[in-house]
Amino acid sequence: MTTRKQSWFESEAALKRVLSAQLGAAFEKAKPRLEKMGDGAANEGARWAQEADHNGPKLINFDHTGARIDEIDYHHSYKALQQLGYGGGIVAATYNPALAAERGTAGKALTMGLGYLFAQAEAGMFCPVCMTDGAARLLVKHGTKTLQERFVPRLASTDLSTLYTGAMFLTEKAGGSDVGQVSTVAKGGNGTPGETVKLFGDKWFCSNVDADVIMILARPEGAGPGTRGLGLYVLPRTLENGQRNAFRIDRIKDKLGERSFPTGEVTLDGAEAYLLGGPGQGFHQMAEMLNLSRLYNAIASVGVMRRSVVEALDWAEQRVAFGKKVIEHPLLTETLLDMASEQRLALLWAFRGVKLMDTVDAGGGSEQERRTLRMLTPLLKYVLGKWAVRVASEGVEVLAGNGYIEDWPMARVLRDAQVLPIWEGTTNILVLDAFRALRKEGGHEVLFAEVEKFASEAPSDVQSRVSALLDEAKHALVELSQDPKAEHAFRDWTDRAALLWTVTTACAKSLGNGSDTDVRAARRVLARHAPVGLLRKDRATVDDVRAVAFR
Protein backbone atom coordinates (compact mmCIF):
# COMPACT_ATOMS: atom_id res chain seq x y z
CA MET A 1 0.00 0.00 0.00
CA THR A 2 1.38 3.41 -0.97
CA THR A 3 2.16 5.70 1.95
CA ARG A 4 0.23 8.96 1.83
CA LYS A 5 2.52 11.96 1.37
CA GLN A 6 2.50 14.89 3.75
CA SER A 7 0.36 17.84 2.70
CA TRP A 8 2.36 20.35 0.68
CA PHE A 9 0.75 23.08 2.76
CA GLU A 10 1.89 21.53 6.02
CA SER A 11 5.44 20.89 4.82
CA GLU A 12 6.29 24.46 3.75
CA ALA A 13 6.70 26.74 6.75
CA ALA A 14 7.46 29.82 4.62
CA LEU A 15 4.13 29.51 2.79
CA LYS A 16 2.15 29.22 6.02
CA ARG A 17 3.93 32.28 7.41
CA VAL A 18 3.24 34.37 4.30
CA LEU A 19 -0.43 33.44 4.12
CA SER A 20 -0.91 34.01 7.83
CA ALA A 21 0.51 37.52 7.46
CA GLN A 22 -1.59 38.38 4.40
CA LEU A 23 -4.88 36.79 5.43
CA GLY A 24 -4.68 38.00 9.01
CA ALA A 25 -7.61 36.91 11.16
CA ALA A 26 -9.11 35.01 8.20
CA PHE A 27 -6.14 32.63 8.10
CA GLU A 28 -7.51 30.27 10.75
CA LYS A 29 -10.81 30.04 8.85
CA ALA A 30 -8.96 29.39 5.57
CA LYS A 31 -6.56 26.78 6.98
CA PRO A 32 -8.83 23.74 6.52
CA ARG A 33 -9.27 24.61 2.84
CA LEU A 34 -5.53 25.13 2.38
CA GLU A 35 -4.74 21.89 4.21
CA LYS A 36 -7.21 19.98 2.05
CA MET A 37 -5.74 21.43 -1.14
CA GLY A 38 -2.18 20.70 0.01
CA ASP A 39 -3.08 17.11 0.84
CA GLY A 40 -5.07 16.52 -2.34
CA ALA A 41 -2.41 18.04 -4.57
CA ALA A 42 0.40 16.00 -3.00
CA ASN A 43 -1.47 12.73 -3.38
CA GLU A 44 -4.41 12.20 -5.76
CA GLY A 45 -3.73 15.44 -7.64
CA ALA A 46 -0.16 14.47 -8.49
CA ARG A 47 -1.37 11.12 -9.81
CA TRP A 48 -4.24 12.65 -11.80
CA ALA A 49 -1.87 15.19 -13.33
CA GLN A 50 0.38 12.43 -14.62
CA GLU A 51 -2.60 10.57 -16.07
CA ALA A 52 -4.08 13.68 -17.69
CA ASP A 53 -0.73 14.50 -19.29
CA HIS A 54 -0.47 11.00 -20.77
CA ASN A 55 -4.14 11.00 -21.89
CA GLY A 56 -4.62 14.43 -23.40
CA PRO A 57 -7.87 15.96 -24.68
CA LYS A 58 -9.27 14.98 -28.06
CA LEU A 59 -11.26 17.19 -30.42
CA ILE A 60 -14.48 15.71 -31.79
CA ASN A 61 -15.64 17.94 -34.66
CA PHE A 62 -18.71 15.93 -35.72
CA ASP A 63 -21.22 13.65 -34.08
CA HIS A 64 -22.44 10.34 -35.50
CA THR A 65 -24.97 12.10 -37.74
CA GLY A 66 -22.38 14.40 -39.27
CA ALA A 67 -23.52 17.46 -37.32
CA ARG A 68 -20.79 19.87 -36.27
CA ILE A 69 -20.32 19.76 -32.50
CA ASP A 70 -16.67 20.76 -31.81
CA GLU A 71 -16.57 19.09 -28.42
CA ILE A 72 -13.51 18.19 -26.37
CA ASP A 73 -13.29 14.69 -24.94
CA TYR A 74 -11.40 14.77 -21.63
CA HIS A 75 -9.86 11.90 -19.72
CA HIS A 76 -11.53 11.27 -16.36
CA SER A 77 -8.34 12.39 -14.58
CA TYR A 78 -8.79 15.92 -15.95
CA LYS A 79 -12.32 16.04 -14.57
CA ALA A 80 -10.93 14.96 -11.22
CA LEU A 81 -8.38 17.78 -11.39
CA GLN A 82 -11.19 20.24 -12.13
CA GLN A 83 -12.93 19.10 -8.98
CA LEU A 84 -9.74 19.61 -6.98
CA GLY A 85 -9.00 23.04 -8.48
CA TYR A 86 -12.36 24.70 -9.07
CA GLY A 87 -14.13 22.64 -6.44
CA GLY A 88 -11.34 23.46 -4.01
CA GLY A 89 -12.15 27.15 -4.42
CA ILE A 90 -9.18 28.66 -6.26
CA VAL A 91 -11.34 31.08 -8.28
CA ALA A 92 -14.19 31.14 -5.79
CA ALA A 93 -11.79 32.40 -3.11
CA THR A 94 -11.87 35.85 -4.73
CA TYR A 95 -15.50 36.16 -5.86
CA ASN A 96 -17.81 33.63 -4.21
CA PRO A 97 -19.72 35.08 -1.21
CA ALA A 98 -19.60 31.68 0.50
CA LEU A 99 -15.83 32.09 0.99
CA ALA A 100 -15.92 35.68 2.29
CA ALA A 101 -14.95 34.75 5.84
CA GLU A 102 -11.98 32.71 4.60
CA ARG A 103 -10.53 35.45 2.40
CA GLY A 104 -11.23 38.47 4.59
CA THR A 105 -9.81 41.43 2.66
CA ALA A 106 -7.19 39.33 0.86
CA GLY A 107 -9.01 37.37 -1.82
CA LYS A 108 -6.00 37.09 -4.07
CA ALA A 109 -3.81 35.82 -1.23
CA LEU A 110 -6.21 32.92 -0.68
CA THR A 111 -6.65 32.33 -4.42
CA MET A 112 -2.90 32.28 -5.03
CA GLY A 113 -2.18 30.21 -1.93
CA LEU A 114 -4.59 27.54 -3.10
CA GLY A 115 -3.39 27.90 -6.68
CA TYR A 116 0.26 27.58 -5.73
CA LEU A 117 -0.44 24.26 -4.01
CA PHE A 118 -2.51 23.05 -6.98
CA ALA A 119 0.16 24.11 -9.51
CA GLN A 120 2.75 21.93 -7.78
CA ALA A 121 0.65 18.96 -8.87
CA GLU A 122 -0.70 20.32 -12.16
CA ALA A 123 0.68 23.47 -13.77
CA GLY A 124 -1.31 22.74 -16.93
CA MET A 125 -4.88 23.12 -15.71
CA PHE A 126 -3.75 26.11 -13.65
CA CYS A 127 -3.95 28.01 -16.97
CA PRO A 128 -7.72 27.51 -17.43
CA VAL A 129 -8.16 28.36 -13.75
CA CYS A 130 -6.26 31.60 -14.37
CA MET A 131 -8.38 32.40 -17.44
CA THR A 132 -11.57 31.79 -15.45
CA ASP A 133 -10.40 34.19 -12.74
CA GLY A 134 -9.46 36.77 -15.38
CA ALA A 135 -12.85 36.61 -17.09
CA ALA A 136 -14.60 37.07 -13.75
CA ARG A 137 -12.30 39.97 -12.90
CA LEU A 138 -13.07 41.88 -16.09
CA LEU A 139 -16.80 41.31 -15.76
CA VAL A 140 -16.81 42.48 -12.14
CA LYS A 141 -14.81 45.60 -12.99
CA HIS A 142 -16.26 46.52 -16.38
CA GLY A 143 -19.32 44.43 -17.20
CA THR A 144 -22.92 45.58 -17.26
CA LYS A 145 -25.16 44.33 -14.49
CA THR A 146 -26.81 41.93 -16.94
CA LEU A 147 -23.47 40.40 -17.97
CA GLN A 148 -22.30 40.17 -14.37
CA GLU A 149 -25.45 38.39 -13.21
CA ARG A 150 -25.34 35.98 -16.14
CA PHE A 151 -21.71 34.95 -15.92
CA VAL A 152 -19.88 35.81 -12.66
CA PRO A 153 -21.68 33.43 -10.25
CA ARG A 154 -20.99 30.51 -12.58
CA LEU A 155 -17.36 31.50 -13.15
CA ALA A 156 -16.98 31.53 -9.34
CA SER A 157 -18.81 28.25 -8.77
CA THR A 158 -17.29 25.32 -6.87
CA ASP A 159 -19.90 22.97 -8.35
CA LEU A 160 -18.76 21.48 -11.67
CA SER A 161 -22.39 21.04 -12.77
CA THR A 162 -22.89 24.83 -12.79
CA LEU A 163 -19.31 25.95 -13.44
CA TYR A 164 -18.36 28.15 -16.38
CA THR A 165 -14.67 28.26 -17.30
CA GLY A 166 -13.02 31.26 -18.94
CA ALA A 167 -10.51 31.99 -21.68
CA MET A 168 -8.71 34.84 -23.42
CA PHE A 169 -8.38 34.73 -27.22
CA LEU A 170 -5.74 37.24 -28.33
CA THR A 171 -3.20 35.67 -30.64
CA GLU A 172 -3.68 35.63 -34.40
CA LYS A 173 -1.44 34.32 -37.15
CA ALA A 174 -0.02 37.77 -37.87
CA GLY A 175 0.24 38.98 -34.30
CA GLY A 176 1.23 37.37 -31.03
CA SER A 177 2.89 39.95 -28.81
CA ASP A 178 2.09 42.58 -31.47
CA VAL A 179 -1.56 42.79 -30.45
CA GLY A 180 -2.12 45.91 -32.57
CA GLN A 181 -2.20 43.67 -35.64
CA VAL A 182 -5.46 41.99 -34.59
CA SER A 183 -7.64 41.64 -37.68
CA THR A 184 -10.76 40.02 -36.21
CA VAL A 185 -13.71 42.30 -37.06
CA ALA A 186 -16.75 43.20 -34.95
CA LYS A 187 -19.80 44.07 -37.03
CA GLY A 188 -22.86 45.90 -35.78
CA GLY A 189 -23.47 47.90 -32.65
CA ASN A 190 -22.95 51.55 -31.83
CA GLY A 191 -20.53 51.33 -28.91
CA THR A 192 -23.03 50.77 -26.11
CA PRO A 193 -21.66 48.54 -23.32
CA GLY A 194 -23.33 45.15 -23.34
CA GLU A 195 -24.61 45.43 -26.91
CA THR A 196 -24.48 42.40 -29.21
CA VAL A 197 -22.12 42.30 -32.20
CA LYS A 198 -21.03 39.66 -34.71
CA LEU A 199 -17.37 38.60 -34.82
CA PHE A 200 -15.52 37.44 -37.93
CA GLY A 201 -11.91 36.26 -38.03
CA ASP A 202 -9.43 33.68 -36.81
CA LYS A 203 -7.63 33.16 -33.51
CA TRP A 204 -4.46 31.10 -33.61
CA PHE A 205 -3.49 30.15 -30.04
CA CYS A 206 -6.53 29.74 -27.82
CA SER A 207 -5.88 28.10 -24.47
CA ASN A 208 -8.85 26.41 -22.80
CA VAL A 209 -10.37 26.48 -26.26
CA ASP A 210 -13.77 25.11 -25.21
CA ALA A 211 -14.27 27.67 -22.45
CA ASP A 212 -17.78 28.92 -21.69
CA VAL A 213 -16.90 32.62 -21.33
CA ILE A 214 -14.19 34.04 -23.57
CA MET A 215 -12.61 37.48 -23.49
CA ILE A 216 -11.69 38.43 -27.04
CA LEU A 217 -10.21 41.45 -28.81
CA ALA A 218 -11.66 42.56 -32.15
CA ARG A 219 -11.68 45.71 -34.26
CA PRO A 220 -15.08 47.36 -34.78
CA GLU A 221 -15.85 48.25 -38.38
CA GLY A 222 -14.36 51.63 -39.17
CA ALA A 223 -12.13 51.74 -36.07
CA GLY A 224 -8.55 52.95 -36.38
CA PRO A 225 -5.38 50.86 -36.48
CA GLY A 226 -3.25 49.55 -33.65
CA THR A 227 -4.33 48.78 -30.12
CA ARG A 228 -6.31 52.04 -29.83
CA GLY A 229 -8.80 50.73 -32.37
CA LEU A 230 -9.56 47.48 -30.54
CA GLY A 231 -12.66 46.63 -28.57
CA LEU A 232 -13.00 43.98 -25.88
CA TYR A 233 -15.90 41.55 -26.12
CA VAL A 234 -17.42 38.72 -24.10
CA LEU A 235 -17.89 35.68 -26.32
CA PRO A 236 -20.12 32.92 -24.88
CA ARG A 237 -19.63 29.40 -26.14
CA THR A 238 -23.36 28.73 -25.89
CA LEU A 239 -26.10 31.24 -26.69
CA GLU A 240 -28.95 31.97 -24.30
CA ASN A 241 -31.26 29.76 -26.38
CA GLY A 242 -28.91 26.82 -25.81
CA GLN A 243 -27.50 26.73 -29.34
CA ARG A 244 -23.78 26.66 -30.18
CA ASN A 245 -22.30 30.04 -30.98
CA ALA A 246 -21.02 30.57 -34.52
CA PHE A 247 -17.36 29.70 -34.11
CA ARG A 248 -15.44 26.57 -35.00
CA ILE A 249 -12.60 24.80 -33.24
CA ASP A 250 -10.44 23.82 -36.20
CA ARG A 251 -7.86 21.76 -34.33
CA ILE A 252 -6.02 21.51 -31.03
CA LYS A 253 -2.28 22.03 -30.77
CA ASP A 254 0.24 19.27 -30.18
CA LYS A 255 2.19 21.03 -27.42
CA LEU A 256 5.53 20.28 -25.78
CA GLY A 257 4.00 20.55 -22.32
CA GLU A 258 0.80 21.54 -20.51
CA ARG A 259 -0.78 18.71 -22.47
CA SER A 260 -3.66 18.06 -20.07
CA PHE A 261 -5.84 20.89 -21.42
CA PRO A 262 -6.64 21.94 -25.00
CA THR A 263 -5.09 24.87 -26.82
CA GLY A 264 -6.65 25.31 -30.23
CA GLU A 265 -7.27 27.30 -33.38
CA VAL A 266 -10.64 28.98 -33.82
CA THR A 267 -12.59 30.46 -36.74
CA LEU A 268 -15.25 33.05 -35.92
CA ASP A 269 -18.04 33.18 -38.49
CA GLY A 270 -20.56 35.67 -37.16
CA ALA A 271 -20.23 34.63 -33.53
CA GLU A 272 -22.36 36.66 -31.13
CA ALA A 273 -20.43 38.63 -28.52
CA TYR A 274 -21.15 41.42 -26.06
CA LEU A 275 -19.21 44.68 -25.88
CA LEU A 276 -17.24 45.19 -22.68
CA GLY A 277 -15.05 48.12 -23.73
CA GLY A 278 -14.84 49.91 -27.07
CA PRO A 279 -11.86 51.48 -28.89
CA GLY A 280 -9.71 53.42 -26.46
CA GLN A 281 -10.82 51.17 -23.59
CA GLY A 282 -10.78 47.58 -24.84
CA PHE A 283 -7.05 47.01 -24.98
CA HIS A 284 -6.47 48.62 -21.58
CA GLN A 285 -9.17 46.44 -20.04
CA MET A 286 -7.64 43.33 -21.58
CA ALA A 287 -4.28 44.43 -20.17
CA GLU A 288 -5.82 44.10 -16.70
CA MET A 289 -6.54 40.43 -17.38
CA LEU A 290 -3.09 40.04 -18.88
CA ASN A 291 -1.44 41.43 -15.75
CA LEU A 292 -3.46 39.09 -13.55
CA SER A 293 -2.33 36.25 -15.83
CA ARG A 294 1.27 37.35 -15.38
CA LEU A 295 0.89 37.12 -11.62
CA TYR A 296 -0.65 33.66 -12.02
CA ASN A 297 2.29 32.76 -14.25
CA ALA A 298 4.70 33.83 -11.51
CA ILE A 299 2.84 31.72 -8.95
CA ALA A 300 2.87 28.76 -11.35
CA SER A 301 6.63 29.25 -11.74
CA VAL A 302 7.13 29.09 -7.98
CA GLY A 303 4.93 25.98 -7.91
CA VAL A 304 7.08 24.30 -10.56
CA MET A 305 10.20 25.23 -8.61
CA ARG A 306 8.72 23.87 -5.39
CA ARG A 307 7.75 20.56 -6.99
CA SER A 308 11.26 20.29 -8.42
CA VAL A 309 12.83 20.91 -5.01
CA VAL A 310 10.53 18.42 -3.28
CA GLU A 311 11.14 15.68 -5.85
CA ALA A 312 14.91 16.28 -5.88
CA LEU A 313 15.20 16.25 -2.10
CA ASP A 314 13.00 13.18 -1.74
CA TRP A 315 15.24 11.29 -4.16
CA ALA A 316 18.50 12.62 -2.73
CA GLU A 317 17.49 11.58 0.80
CA GLN A 318 16.84 8.00 -0.36
CA ARG A 319 19.39 7.29 -3.07
CA VAL A 320 22.71 5.82 -1.92
CA ALA A 321 25.77 6.10 -4.16
CA PHE A 322 29.45 5.63 -3.37
CA GLY A 323 28.66 4.60 0.18
CA LYS A 324 26.38 7.44 1.31
CA LYS A 325 23.15 9.24 0.54
CA VAL A 326 23.59 11.42 -2.53
CA ILE A 327 22.40 14.49 -0.61
CA GLU A 328 25.60 14.17 1.44
CA HIS A 329 27.90 14.54 -1.57
CA PRO A 330 29.16 18.16 -1.44
CA LEU A 331 28.51 19.10 -5.07
CA LEU A 332 24.93 17.87 -4.92
CA THR A 333 24.43 19.53 -1.55
CA GLU A 334 25.43 22.82 -3.20
CA THR A 335 23.02 22.23 -6.09
CA LEU A 336 20.13 21.43 -3.78
CA LEU A 337 20.75 24.51 -1.64
CA ASP A 338 20.79 26.69 -4.76
CA MET A 339 17.47 25.19 -5.86
CA ALA A 340 15.83 25.55 -2.46
CA SER A 341 17.13 29.10 -1.98
CA GLU A 342 15.85 30.32 -5.33
CA GLN A 343 12.47 28.71 -4.70
CA ARG A 344 12.14 30.30 -1.26
CA LEU A 345 13.03 33.76 -2.56
CA ALA A 346 10.68 33.30 -5.51
CA LEU A 347 7.83 32.50 -3.12
CA LEU A 348 8.42 35.57 -0.97
CA TRP A 349 8.82 37.86 -3.98
CA ALA A 350 5.75 36.54 -5.82
CA PHE A 351 3.55 36.99 -2.76
CA ARG A 352 4.79 40.56 -2.49
CA GLY A 353 3.02 41.02 -5.82
CA VAL A 354 -0.08 39.24 -4.50
CA LYS A 355 -0.19 41.54 -1.48
CA LEU A 356 0.08 44.63 -3.68
CA MET A 357 -2.73 43.41 -5.94
CA ASP A 358 -5.02 42.82 -2.96
CA THR A 359 -4.21 46.28 -1.61
CA VAL A 360 -4.78 48.04 -4.93
CA ASP A 361 -7.94 46.04 -5.69
CA ALA A 362 -9.42 46.99 -2.33
CA GLY A 363 -9.09 50.65 -3.24
CA GLY A 364 -6.85 51.44 -0.30
CA GLY A 365 -3.59 51.41 -2.16
CA SER A 366 -1.54 54.55 -2.58
CA GLU A 367 -0.30 55.81 -5.93
CA GLN A 368 3.11 54.54 -4.86
CA GLU A 369 1.72 51.03 -4.36
CA ARG A 370 -0.08 51.11 -7.72
CA ARG A 371 3.15 52.11 -9.48
CA THR A 372 5.05 49.44 -7.57
CA LEU A 373 2.62 46.75 -8.74
CA ARG A 374 2.90 48.04 -12.30
CA MET A 375 6.70 47.76 -12.25
CA LEU A 376 6.81 44.51 -10.31
CA THR A 377 4.37 42.50 -12.43
CA PRO A 378 6.45 42.09 -15.63
CA LEU A 379 9.61 41.48 -13.60
CA LEU A 380 7.96 38.75 -11.54
CA LYS A 381 6.64 37.01 -14.61
CA TYR A 382 9.82 36.98 -16.65
CA VAL A 383 12.39 36.36 -13.91
CA LEU A 384 10.49 33.58 -12.18
CA GLY A 385 9.55 31.96 -15.49
CA LYS A 386 13.24 31.69 -16.37
CA TRP A 387 14.13 30.47 -12.87
CA ALA A 388 11.43 27.79 -13.08
CA VAL A 389 12.93 26.27 -16.22
CA ARG A 390 16.41 26.22 -14.70
CA VAL A 391 15.31 24.74 -11.37
CA ALA A 392 13.15 22.12 -13.10
CA SER A 393 16.10 21.17 -15.30
CA GLU A 394 18.27 20.77 -12.20
CA GLY A 395 15.53 18.64 -10.68
CA VAL A 396 15.57 16.32 -13.67
CA GLU A 397 19.35 16.05 -13.40
CA VAL A 398 19.24 15.20 -9.69
CA LEU A 399 17.05 12.21 -10.53
CA ALA A 400 19.40 11.43 -13.44
CA GLY A 401 17.99 8.81 -15.79
CA ASN A 402 14.80 8.50 -13.77
CA GLY A 403 14.23 12.22 -14.17
CA TYR A 404 14.30 11.80 -17.94
CA ILE A 405 11.66 9.07 -18.00
CA GLU A 406 7.97 9.90 -18.41
CA ASP A 407 7.02 7.35 -15.73
CA TRP A 408 8.46 9.80 -13.20
CA PRO A 409 7.03 13.31 -12.70
CA MET A 410 10.07 15.49 -13.39
CA ALA A 411 10.05 15.03 -17.18
CA ARG A 412 6.51 16.44 -17.26
CA VAL A 413 7.37 19.20 -14.80
CA LEU A 414 10.23 20.34 -17.05
CA ARG A 415 8.07 20.21 -20.18
CA ASP A 416 5.36 22.20 -18.43
CA ALA A 417 7.90 24.74 -17.15
CA GLN A 418 9.09 25.69 -20.62
CA VAL A 419 5.90 27.58 -21.44
CA LEU A 420 6.25 29.87 -18.41
CA PRO A 421 8.76 32.23 -20.08
CA ILE A 422 6.61 32.28 -23.23
CA TRP A 423 2.96 33.02 -22.71
CA GLU A 424 1.65 36.34 -21.39
CA GLY A 425 4.75 37.90 -22.99
CA THR A 426 8.14 36.40 -23.71
CA THR A 427 11.15 37.53 -21.71
CA ASN A 428 12.19 40.28 -24.10
CA ILE A 429 8.62 41.59 -24.43
CA LEU A 430 8.42 41.82 -20.64
CA VAL A 431 11.75 43.62 -20.43
CA LEU A 432 10.37 46.21 -22.85
CA ASP A 433 7.18 46.45 -20.78
CA ALA A 434 9.22 47.04 -17.64
CA PHE A 435 11.05 49.85 -19.40
CA ARG A 436 7.71 51.35 -20.46
CA ALA A 437 6.69 51.38 -16.81
CA LEU A 438 10.05 52.89 -15.97
CA ARG A 439 9.73 55.71 -18.51
CA LYS A 440 6.03 56.49 -18.25
CA GLU A 441 5.42 55.94 -14.54
CA GLY A 442 8.83 56.25 -12.91
CA GLY A 443 9.00 52.54 -12.22
CA HIS A 444 12.68 52.77 -11.35
CA GLU A 445 11.84 55.18 -8.53
CA VAL A 446 9.53 52.74 -6.75
CA LEU A 447 11.93 49.87 -7.42
CA PHE A 448 14.87 51.76 -5.91
CA ALA A 449 12.71 52.86 -2.97
CA GLU A 450 11.66 49.30 -2.11
CA VAL A 451 15.15 47.90 -2.51
CA GLU A 452 16.63 50.61 -0.28
CA LYS A 453 13.92 50.23 2.37
CA PHE A 454 14.12 46.44 2.49
CA ALA A 455 17.93 46.46 2.38
CA SER A 456 17.94 48.66 5.48
CA GLU A 457 16.21 45.79 7.31
CA ALA A 458 18.84 43.24 6.21
CA PRO A 459 22.06 42.21 7.99
CA SER A 460 25.00 44.51 7.37
CA ASP A 461 26.81 42.22 4.92
CA VAL A 462 23.74 41.92 2.68
CA GLN A 463 23.03 45.62 3.05
CA SER A 464 26.57 46.54 2.00
CA ARG A 465 26.61 44.27 -1.04
CA VAL A 466 23.16 45.39 -2.19
CA SER A 467 24.11 49.04 -1.76
CA ALA A 468 27.13 48.65 -4.03
CA LEU A 469 25.13 46.78 -6.67
CA LEU A 470 22.27 49.28 -6.48
CA ASP A 471 24.65 52.19 -7.04
CA GLU A 472 25.96 50.35 -10.08
CA ALA A 473 22.40 49.85 -11.36
CA LYS A 474 21.57 53.53 -10.88
CA HIS A 475 24.64 54.64 -12.82
CA ALA A 476 23.90 52.12 -15.57
CA LEU A 477 20.35 53.42 -15.90
CA VAL A 478 21.67 56.94 -16.45
CA GLU A 479 23.87 55.58 -19.24
CA LEU A 480 20.92 53.78 -20.81
CA SER A 481 18.77 56.90 -20.68
CA GLN A 482 21.41 58.85 -22.58
CA ASP A 483 21.80 56.31 -25.38
CA PRO A 484 18.86 56.08 -27.83
CA LYS A 485 20.23 52.79 -29.16
CA ALA A 486 20.67 51.09 -25.79
CA GLU A 487 17.81 48.60 -26.05
CA HIS A 488 20.28 45.73 -26.42
CA ALA A 489 21.32 46.24 -22.77
CA PHE A 490 17.84 46.52 -21.23
CA ARG A 491 17.74 42.88 -20.20
CA ASP A 492 21.09 43.05 -18.41
CA TRP A 493 19.81 45.98 -16.37
CA THR A 494 16.45 44.43 -15.49
CA ASP A 495 18.10 41.14 -14.49
CA ARG A 496 20.24 42.97 -11.96
CA ALA A 497 17.43 45.20 -10.70
CA ALA A 498 15.13 42.20 -10.26
CA LEU A 499 17.83 40.29 -8.38
CA LEU A 500 18.19 43.11 -5.87
CA TRP A 501 14.44 43.36 -5.44
CA THR A 502 14.15 39.62 -4.87
CA VAL A 503 17.00 39.40 -2.37
CA THR A 504 15.91 42.39 -0.30
CA THR A 505 12.26 41.30 -0.21
CA ALA A 506 13.40 38.11 1.52
CA CYS A 507 15.14 40.23 4.16
CA ALA A 508 12.24 42.63 4.72
CA LYS A 509 11.10 42.31 8.32
CA SER A 510 8.37 44.87 7.59
CA LEU A 511 6.77 42.25 5.31
CA GLY A 512 7.12 39.49 7.92
CA ASN A 513 10.22 38.10 6.21
CA GLY A 514 13.82 38.32 7.36
CA SER A 515 14.08 35.11 9.38
CA ASP A 516 17.51 33.52 9.69
CA THR A 517 16.51 31.02 7.01
CA ASP A 518 15.21 33.75 4.69
CA VAL A 519 18.49 35.60 5.03
CA ARG A 520 20.49 32.40 4.49
CA ALA A 521 18.65 31.86 1.22
CA ALA A 522 19.04 35.51 0.23
CA ARG A 523 22.81 35.41 0.77
CA ARG A 524 22.99 32.26 -1.31
CA VAL A 525 21.07 33.70 -4.26
CA LEU A 526 22.98 36.98 -4.14
CA ALA A 527 26.33 35.18 -4.14
CA ARG A 528 25.28 32.97 -7.03
CA HIS A 529 23.88 35.69 -9.30
CA ALA A 530 26.29 38.48 -8.38
CA PRO A 531 29.43 36.64 -7.21
CA VAL A 532 32.48 38.26 -5.68
CA GLY A 533 35.41 36.26 -7.01
CA LEU A 534 35.41 32.90 -8.72
CA LEU A 535 35.20 30.51 -5.75
CA ARG A 536 32.34 30.36 -3.28
CA LYS A 537 33.32 31.17 0.28
CA ASP A 538 30.42 29.43 2.04
CA ARG A 539 29.79 25.71 2.02
CA ALA A 540 26.33 24.19 1.92
CA THR A 541 25.38 21.61 4.52
CA VAL A 542 22.59 19.08 4.44
CA ASP A 543 20.94 20.89 7.35
CA ASP A 544 21.07 24.15 5.35
CA VAL A 545 19.18 22.46 2.53
CA ARG A 546 16.52 21.04 4.82
CA ALA A 547 16.12 24.34 6.66
CA VAL A 548 15.72 26.48 3.54
CA ALA A 549 13.31 23.98 1.98
CA PHE A 550 11.08 23.25 4.95
CA ARG A 551 11.59 25.57 7.94
Region spans (language model):
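Flexible, glycine/threonine-enriched loop-and-boundary segments that flank and lead into catalytic domains
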Residues: 167-213, 370-386, 390-406, 482-486
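Extended, charge-enriched "interface" segments that sit outside catalytic cores
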Residues: 1-104, 465
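C-terminal helix-coil-helix/basic helical segment that borders enzyme active sites and/or dimer interfaces
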Residues: 344-381, 478-490, 508-512
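Internal helix-loop-helix
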Residues: 68-162, 207-209, 423, 514, ...
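A short core secondary-structure module
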Residues: 195-246
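C-terminal amphipathic alpha-helical interaction region
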Residues: 453-551
